[in-house]
Amino acid sequence: MENSQLCKLFIGGLNVQTSESGLRGHFEAFGTLTDCVVVVNPQTKRSRCFGFVTYSNVEEADAAMAASPHAVDGNTVELKRAVSREDSARPGAHAKVKKLFVGGLKGDVAEGDLIEHFSQFGAVEKAEIIADKQSGKKRGFGFVYFQSHDAADKAAVVKFHPIQGHRVEVKKAVPKEDIHAGGGGARAARGGRGGGRGRGGGGGGGGRDQNGLAKGGGGGGGGYNSYGGYGGYGAYGGGGGGGGSYGGSDYGNGFGGFGSYSQHQSSYGPMKSGGGGGGGGSWGGRSNSGPYRGGYGGGYGGGSF
């Protein structure tokens, strides 16, 4: 399960006075930090009231998550797994869910196989594989239900998983109303603590990919200028982009566009040695050891701020 992206945590709601040394001083109690940054306005150098820490291994990041809630300089802060730059604009990438969509399932995969695989990320309540109501034929996708949000976040960060020798794709199962179907825009954000009030911006366009999966367009403007509210993180600002949910209709009614998923299973193919990694890589050109400074802007809304 070792994946560098799982070692990276987002910290929101920081005190405007919290420095990088102060942030490091708090979180290094749970392990060795390979990177620590408080995001600031490049012109004013004023804190944007959020930041990131990267641990040397997943176990240390897990320990920090397990110790939540954290209070830093008098503020109770929010911890989440950091979403990679390339995935940050995907609709629902920052959603707080316990349910994941799993696509590209082969016919020999059983619900028990899903439970066994995904239990490495945290306790699984149940798994279901969707079948055609008339024929009973499996439709090539299903859902996994976790007991905690962090377990779902961890599994979603990896993105591609090996199940029965084949690569499957994992996405957060975000309800239609939460993803602003049809490319609806992000809601206006509220200002950060001590950091000024952001303006609500326009929403991005939505769409669908060839599998009928929700495909986001541009992210909503949101607060914190072009950051889209921490790039779509929780209630700190605008959501992360538009897009139709499950192909544009409620998945309870034929699972929307997911019904066509089985037609494209072959695109996943057998797992190859070393395959299946996801969510890693550099943020804006920096190496994994220092993924934020100078590179995070593109993944969290970009633009000037």
UniProtKB/Swiss-Prot annotation:
The modification Phosphoserine is found at S68, S84. Gene3D superfamilies: 3.30.70.330. The modification Asymmetric dimethylarginine is found at R293. Residues 178-211, 265-305 are annotated as: Disordered. Keywords: Acetylation, Isopeptide bond, Methylation, Nucleus, Phosphoprotein, Repeat, Ribonucleoprotein, RNA-binding, Ubl conjugation. InterPro entries: hnRNPA0_RRM1, Nucleotide-bd_a/b_plait_sf, RBD_domain_sf, RRM_dom. PROSITE patterns: RRM. The modification N-acetylmethionine is found at M1. The modification N6-acetyllysine is found at K133. It is found in: Nucleus. GO terms for cellular component: nucleoplasm; ribonucleoprotein complex; synapse. mRNA-binding component of ribonucleosomes. Specifically binds AU-rich element (ARE)-containing mRNAs. Involved in post-transcriptional regulation of cytokines mRNAs. This is Heterogeneous nuclear ribonucleoprotein A0. The lineage of its organism: Eukaryota, Metazoa, Chordata, Craniata, Vertebrata.
